[in-house]
């Protein structure tokens, strides 16, 4: 049954388009741990219930949110903190967008 299936680090990496080394790094930093670590082989295994958390971490990284902030979000799981984190990042991205638009306008002016 799929709900009880264990996924190796390689399978998890491939399914989520993420490097195995990134999963190891997230584990090392306390951001995303495997469900099971075999004590004899030290192989990491993940379960299907971890998929949504990994997708959330990937989304937050795509927004350029620092790992320190992502770890705090995961540790706290506080809706108010999550909302604040996203609002803050949105403002930073809008500021960056305005800077890019300004630079493009200057470039366009110099071209013509």
Protein language model annotation of sequence segments:
Residues 1-63:
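Basic helix-turn-helix/winged-helix DNA-binding cores
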Residues 58, 70-112:
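Short, charged amphipathic alpha-helical surface segments
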């Amino acid at each position: 049954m799929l709900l009880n299936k264990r996924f190796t680090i390689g399978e998890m990496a491939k399914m989520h388009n993420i490097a195995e080394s990134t999963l190891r790094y997230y584990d090392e930093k306390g951001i995303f741990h495997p469900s099971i670590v075999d004590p004899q082989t030290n192989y990491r295994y993940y379960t299907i219930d971890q998929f949504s958390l990994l997708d959330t971490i990937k989304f937050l990284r795509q927004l350029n949110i620092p790992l320190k902030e992502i770890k705090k979000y995961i540790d706290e799981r506080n809706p108010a903190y999550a909302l604040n984190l996203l609002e803050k990042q949105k403002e930073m991205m809008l500021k960056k967008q305005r800077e890019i638009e300004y630079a493009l306008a200057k470039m366009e002016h110099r071209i013509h």
